[in-house]
Amino acid sequence: MYVVDAIRKEPYRDPANGNYIWRPPYPKSKPRERPVRPSSRGDFDHPRPGSRLFSAATAYASVRCVLDIWEFYLGRRLSLVGKSGQRKFEIIPRVTALGDNAWSGEWYIELGFADRNPRKPYCENLDVIAHEVGHIILKHVIGPTPKGRLEFERKSHDEAGADLVSLVSILHFDRVVDAVLERTRGKLFSVNILSQIGEYRMGWSGRRAARLLFQNKTMRSVAHARRAGDKYVYARPLLGAAFDILVEIYEARLVGRGLIPKELANRSTHATARGHPAIRREFAAQFKANPDGFADALREATADFARLLATAWRMARRTGVTFSRVASNIAAADARLNRGRYGETIHRAFARRGITVRVGRS
């Protein structure tokens, strides 16, 4: 894996439609900035924020971080270059011509700028990078996208899956955990930092994505998206169900630690903080008494959730991908890893969205 800080580079794919114009590797004859070198101490602490060196170092560190996290949960190393013959994965941190976008392929990731603003490079946004790396992880773990009737649902699943890769990755940072809990006072069934993961430019449309993880979309309510070919909107029920599962696992961990009573967790399920202020006040009082315990519960829930996803995606290489099959794989993963500890939560979350969990699928 290496960074190429290319100068005046044209995107590998057409920003208008996503079709490939040319492919990596970036030719050595084309202009580029000098590579970042370690200090005499062997670290990379010296690049100044706002500089191209900082962007390059940050992009590399972010990709490596996401891979390290998910290789741990998957239990194996991931090769990023496939069978292309290209020996190294290429990271291009600043591609102005890409505009307000970021994308990845079998051999590379290249990143543009939020609002086309050169002061807002996506290469310094871990959410964006983790989402793009998520696409690569899913392709390597599950396999290539099939052609035919299952193609659309697989692509839609991968948009949700890439956001979940980002969600889990970001929750490995203590500052994020602390900030989320401080802002929500421990009640995560709400619109917050976590529930807005993946909310950046959507595909090639240039429209701001509204992919809130905390929402009530069902398969019936997004049926029009399938007819319109909108994989982002169609993914919302799957994404919302997965977020519900994470939060309910977190609340189960709080109950197990004696930090909240079980009846509060039961009342909290998908109840908004704004619509149910009494529940928020109860959470706030419990959180104030032991914020560190809440943080530990969220870390434990994140690990449980990531293991379920990793196991379900490994199964999907054999079962194939539909929303129902992936939901069933998550239930089967829980039976295998946790003896069905979260089975009721998983079935309820997917049933609420109109996604069928088939008992016994593994």
Task: List each language-model region with its residue ranges.
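Zinc-dependent metallohydrolase catalytic domains
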Residues: 53-56, 60-108, 112-126, 138-362
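Acidic/polar low-complexity interaction segments
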Residues: 1-64, 68-72, 80-84, 139, ...
